[in-house]
UniProtKB/Swiss-Prot annotation:
Belongs to the DSS1/SEM1 family. InterPro entries: DSS1_SEM1. The keyword Glycoprotein does not apply. GO terms for biological process: mRNA export from nucleus; proteasome assembly. One of its GO terms (cellular component) is proteasome regulatory particle, lid subcomplex. The keyword Transferase does not apply. Keywords: Proteasome. The gene is DSS1(I). Residues 58-74 have a biased composition (Basic and acidic residues). This is Protein DELETION OF SUV3 SUPPRESSOR 1(I).
């Protein structure tokens, strides 16, 4: 009789592991998503001024100096 309560507690633990599955929505396997949703193509992938960085700012000068020092040590 001692084995029966242990089996019941083991089953309760297994059920607790799978209770979080209720948070996910289930979908049909054969659903065709492309027909239901419009696919929009984005023609512009980046900003027009993406290359307007100042290469002579403090950070760029410090980085260039560190790179030069690193190559001198080798």
């Amino acid at each position: 009789m001692a084995a029966e309560p242990k089996a019941a507690t083991a089953e309760v633990v297994k059920m607790d592991l799978f209770e979080d599955d209720d948070e996910f929505e289930e979908f049909e396997i054969n659903e065709d998503w492309l027909e239901k949703e419009e696919v929009k193509e984005v023609s512009q992938q980046w900003e027009d001024d993406w290359d307007d960085d100042d290469v002579n700012d403090d950070f760029s000068r410090q980085l260039r100096k560190e790179l030069e020092n690193g190559t001198d040590k080798k």
